Swiss-Prot record:
It comes from the Bacteria. InterPro entries: Ribosomal_bS16, Ribosomal_bS16_dom_sf. Belongs to the bacterial ribosomal protein bS16 family. This is Small ribosomal subunit protein bS16. GO terms for molecular function: structural constituent of ribosome. HAMAP family: Ribosomal_bS16 (MF_00385). Keywords: Ribonucleoprotein, Ribosomal protein. Pfam families: Ribosomal_S16. It comes from Buchnera aphidicola subsp. Acyrthosiphon pisum (strain APS) (Acyrthosiphon pisum symbiotic bacterium). GO terms for biological process: translation. The gene is rpsP. GO terms for cellular component: cytoplasm; small ribosomal subunit. Transmembrane segments: none annotated. NCBIfam families: S16.
Length: 79
């Protein structure tokens, strides 16, 4: 099954997440099909906290991709 989910990057205690489309059998930070945006929960100054490609997200959901709960909340927040 294809899922839209967050992959964790960054360093210890300074997380940075990429929103990716990946097969559910792959590990969290493993192979992915496409990168759809990012989420930086500790952004400072003029840095963007959330950037999403809503057009591609719509494309993947129409193709049958399932979203994680956190991803659903972030997309709802962006719209």
């Amino acid at each position: 099954m294809v899922k839209i989910r967050l992959a964790r990057y960054g360093t210890k205690k300074r997380p940075f997440y990429k929103l990716v489309v990946a097969d559910s059998r792959f590990s969290r930070n493993g192979r992915f099909i496409e990168r759809l945006g990012y989420f930086n929960p500790i952004a400072k100054g003029k840095s963007e906290i959330l950037k999403l490609n809503l057009e591609r997200i719509e494309h993947w959901t129409n193709q049958g991709a399932q979203m994680s709960e956190r991803t659903k909340k972030l997309i709802k927040q962006k719209r």
